[in-house]
Amino acid sequence: MSRKGPRAEVCADCSAPDPGWASISRGVLVCDECCSVHRSLGRHISIVKHLRHSAWPPTLLQMVHTLASNGANSIWEHSLLDPAQVQSGRRKANPQDKVHPIKSEFIRAKYQMLAFVHKLPCRDDDGVTAKDLSKQLHSSVRTGNLETCLRLLSLGAQANFFHPEKGTTPLHVAAKAGQTLQAELLVVYGADPGSPDVNGRTPIDYARQAGHHELAERLVECQYELTDRLAFYLCGRKPDHKNGHYIIPQMADSLDLSELAKAAKKKLQALSNRLFEELAMDVYDEVDRRENDAVWLATQNHSTLVTERSAVPFLPVNPEYSATRNQGRQKLARFNAREFATLIIDILSEAKRRQQGKSLSSPTDNLELSLRSQSDLDDQHDYDSVASDEDTDQEPLRSTGATRSNRARSMDSSDLSDGAVTLQEYLELKKALATSEAKVQQLMKVNSSLSDELRRLQREIHKLQAENLQLRQPPGPVPTPPLPSERAEHTPMAPGGSTHRRDRQAFSMYEPGSALKPFGGPPGDELTTRLQPFHSTELEDDAIYSVHVPAGLYRIRKGVSASAVPFTPSSPLLSCSQEGSRHTSKLSRHGSGADSDYENTQSGDPLLGLEGKRFLELGKEEDFHPELESLDGDLDPGLPSTEDVILKTEQVTKNIQELLRAAQEFKHDSFVPCSEKIHLAVTEMASLFPKRPALEPVRSSLRLLNASAYRLQSECRKTVPPEPGAPVDFQLLTQQVIQCAYDIAKAAKQLVTITTREKKQ
């Protein structure tokens, strides 16, 4: 289906006349030269289709023309309309400019970097901003203003946003209001037509109840867009979604199956739902690339544009995906037509089996479904050997010269609605499942709330136990601060002397011989036996013991000062290692005045370890509470799956890379939101592991991971000075931030290594 605009259009990127391509996700029309750059960016940046030679749903084409005619291009070129930008030398590309590097650099800056999009004045909290934008989108889709919704989506609004008060998504609102074009735009940006509302009703149900039957049918097509597109690529047909949702072609010579093909099919069936969905989406993107390649070669007519630089030989890299997945996506281009068709048939069959809930069948039951090994396949071109004599009027688009009609007749379509389950029963079951899932989510939220309340009560109990034990102790003499003459005894006798007074303690801070251990610490823990709990008025909400050092009391070498260092018994400062006990015991035995023995500490005897110094620095900002609980009780030997740990590690690494880019670009105002994202990713990764892991390497790695994440937050908050105009040493701060990020990455790598090793054993 094709349609031209009512007026002469120009390319949105270089103003060339009569553009032949459309960017669906950007709502603009582009010429052939600019389209070659769009295709090289990938579908995650720009989804392109030819206006005349590609198959278009009528409402989708109408949506693109509406956006293009209403000035959607001004969204992506907002700052270029400012006269100040013209004076600075930044300009739009011209039709006479070369594709590389002028047009390509401009298009990348425009769509990939979003260099010309209007920026919001305040982006301190991206989460709150995205939520507000999504709520605006939720309200705007009931109207017919497409440009406003596209602008909100470009600023970060979520198409699948679930409104907490109204219990619906934007697609529910658009379907109820009958806004077909708004629904098309939302689906392009990832809205799910099958997502239930708070009552389990989908946007399709909303459209039908409101009497918008054509919109409901279109939403059903969007729900099965992936399988419909794969089937249409093979045989040129789509299911009508009334008698069935799947058309599964089969190879005419599929009875000749090898053992390798049967084994490959079993591997496909053994994939988890998430991995199978990722594979299906990657094959969908490869189908789109091959169809656009066919259109490109057919329309260029071997002109100068058909060059290596304008071709897209494989799927471009998507930075949101892992390196392994990107490599697998690119290897799909190496499949010849026969291999690729066999893979598509297997995916269609497996998708149908999974959605209908059928059990796995033996390979002999479905001889037409297989995955071919590349070494066992011949070099036949497409499906010429099984082409039919029937002719169609479709125009040739394949580079091999074979027509889509021949390919359609070379396949036998399977039944559209086999199986004992009727469509009505399936829809009822799906609705009941959606309702059950909504109830499960609600119960999970209630459970989480109760768990938080239980943890709070446990902290209160520990606090009361500590106060009770303190009140039961016999009263002792209250130590008084020493006189200045007495404090003088703590200073060295000579400035250059190397003799240190090691037999004195800090005044009124530590009570020697105290054996109070409410947490059941190890008997040999020297530091715990030297701590006395403060009065209840000095206790923090989440900490029972703290080493309270008055400001300026100790001056540690290299300018590190300790003001308040709260910790729990599970923190690294309370470990039973001799090194940590020796270093910490020195802290309790030294200095009582402004001039303490720390100023003369020998270089060969470090006062605190590196980890201890980091905890002291962290204590200057806020209390630190490690995520690991006390190790009282049974230890849990269980470990999460290696796949889950690697997935969370990639998320942590991605957020760290974003932070490092901000540091390289001197965007210090981005430190705080980046650190929040890293902390969230670290929390999700730590939640994979048991509360009391049995392996000591796992416990130490988790402590380092959580401690570094908290310290990173503390360091990043220093970018905002406590008083306006106060100087901030950004160079030193950046070094501290990079060090924290390194510690987080190191701990995450250790957890991946440990998990992989333990799973192999």
UniProtKB/Swiss-Prot annotation:
Location of region: Required for localization at synapses: 366-587
PTM comment, free text: Phosphorylated by PAK1. Phosphorylation on tyrosine residues may be catalyzed by PTK2/FAK1 and SRC in growing fibroblasts. Phosphorylation at Tyr-383 is induced by activation of Ephrin-B1/EFNB1 and catalyzed by SRC family kinases. It is required for the interaction with NCK2 and for GIT1 recruitment to synapses in hippocampal neurons.
Compartment annotation: Cytoplasm; Synapse; Presynapse; Postsynapse
Domain of life: Eukaryota
Region (Interaction with PTK2/FAK1): 253-415
Example of a GO MF term: protein tyrosine kinase binding
Region (Interaction with IKBKG) residue spans: 420-620
InterPro entries reported for this sequence: Ankyrin_rpt (IPR002110), Ankyrin_rpt-contain_sf (IPR036770), ARFGAP/RecO (IPR037278), ArfGAP_dom (IPR001164), ArfGAP_dom_sf (IPR038508), GIT-like (IPR047161), GIT1/2_CC (IPR032352), GIT1_C (IPR022018)
Entry's induction text: Up-regulated at the transcriptional level by MYC.
Residue ranges, annotated region (Interaction with gamma-tubulin and localization to the centrosome): 1-124
Annotated stretches, region: Interaction with NCK2 and GRIN3A: 366-587
Compositional bias ranges of the Polar residues kind: 357-374
Compositionally biased residues, Pro residues: 474-484
Renumbered residue ranges of the record's region Disordered: 354-416, 471-501, 572-606
Protein name as it appears in the record: ARF GTPase-activating protein GIT1
The organism's taxonomic lineage, starting at the top: Eukaryota, Metazoa, Chordata, Craniata, Vertebrata
